[in-house]
Amino acid sequence: MEFSERKRSRKSQSFKLVSRDYHHEVYKISEFSNDVNGETKETQPIYLGDESMEIKKQITGMRRLLNDSTGRIYQRVGKEGEKLKQEPQVVDLVWPQRSNSSTEASQGLHSNSRGAWNELPTQSGQFSGQSGPRSRTFQTQPHISASSNGELPGVNSIVGSNCCTCNCQSTLQAILQELKTMRKLMQFQAVGTQNRQQPPISLMCSQRTAVSRKRNKKKKVLPKTVQPVTAVEPKPSPLETEKKPAASATRPPGLQAAERTSTEENHVLGFGIVLESPSSDPEVQLAEGFDVFMPKSQLDSILSNYTRSGSLLFRKLVCAFFDDKTLANSLPNGKRKRGFNDNRKGLDQNIVGAIKVFTENYCTANHVDKLPGPRDWVQILQDQIKLARRRLKRGSAEVADGDERLDRISLPPTGHTFVIKRETPEDPEPGSVA
């Protein structure tokens, strides 16, 4: 009989890892059969040809899938140095050949083979559910085959008859078919449980879109300002149309045309929230969330003249809200400088934030070039502060020059009188010289 040694590799003090080629669970299936008297008896499985070996390999593969995904078998071992050397001679790798100790056993195998194989699916179900060291320790115990007389059957190297091999091939094929059906059932059950746990696709899509919207709202502030503006702005449009006929009688036609174009641009672009006001010129809220308002006519004039670049629009809006004195005595980032002699204060960040949001929305909607970056806003404010200081210096210098000019204009008559006074005492000097 052909034997091959089972390879082992040391895993730990209490476990040994059997190589993946060995699958003791599979070989143990055919070790039980019924005796002639009906008693259970362990018999060695029959060595079959190449076809049967292929079927057995398929069975081992299916059992590997059903039992353990990794295919590893850990066997429990006693304490250190306790019966570790005696284990390799217990189990074989090769499917052993059938023992021909008695002809009655072969007849019993033929007569009761169908009953024995019918019991195998239940055993396979039991083996498929087992996991852990207990089931495997039971498998590693030496199997003592005993006949009805109590004698140990010998192992014979003679191959069984063709009839027996045919019967075993059919039974092996039946086992393989049942294992395949079991695997399909397990897969269907797993898919059914997953489908029960997962919500329907429509709900998943709606949840994902809601989550993505929330994330976008948290990250970006701009869409918040744009969306409500477009929804709120068309409402006051009929009020504006009612106010236009009353104001058109008093205003020239050129201003009326300019206002029409500007209002159309505002309605199309959706910027600024027009608010009702008792005066003829309504106020516009630059951005939602900021209590910053601006006369609509002034905003229309800025949008019609200074929309070449986003930085220019931002500069003009800053100049519209802050005069030169406030800019000259302020800091761009809203913080107070830590100096005892420095009285400068930060700019109102509410106004600056509203202007910034308005320019960003306008430039992105109208595709205006040169939109200021995150670091450019403070630089633009610093430039505007410097320009305001220069204007104040020039204005003070011009005022001083104007005062000097006024003094010069008033000085000649007074100088003339002084010259007359000076000439009177100088008259006797030439007389004295003469």
From Swiss-Prot:
InterPro entries listed in its UniProt record: BEN_domain, BEN_domain_protein_7
Polar residues compositional bias, start-end: 97-150
Coiled-coil boundaries: none
Entry keyword annotation includes S-adenosyl-L-methionine: no
Region listing for Disordered, in residue ranges: 96-151, 212-262, 414-434
Sites bearing Phosphothreonine, chain numbering: T326
Positions bearing the Glycyl lysine isopeptide (Lys-Gly) (interchain with G-Cter in SUMO2) cross-link: K16, K56, K85, K244
Residue numbers of Phosphoserine PTMs: S330
BEN domain span: 289-399
SMART domains for the chain: BEN (SM01025)
Pfam family of the protein (one): BEN
Gene3D superfamilies in the record: BEN domain
Source taxon at top rank: Eukaryota
Gene Ontology MF annotations: DNA binding
UniProt entry keywords in alphabetical sequence: Isopeptide bond, Phosphoprotein, Ubl conjugation
Biased segments, Basic residues type: 212-222
Protein name listed in UniProt: BEN domain-containing protein 7
Lineage: Eukaryota, Metazoa, Chordata, Craniata, Vertebrata
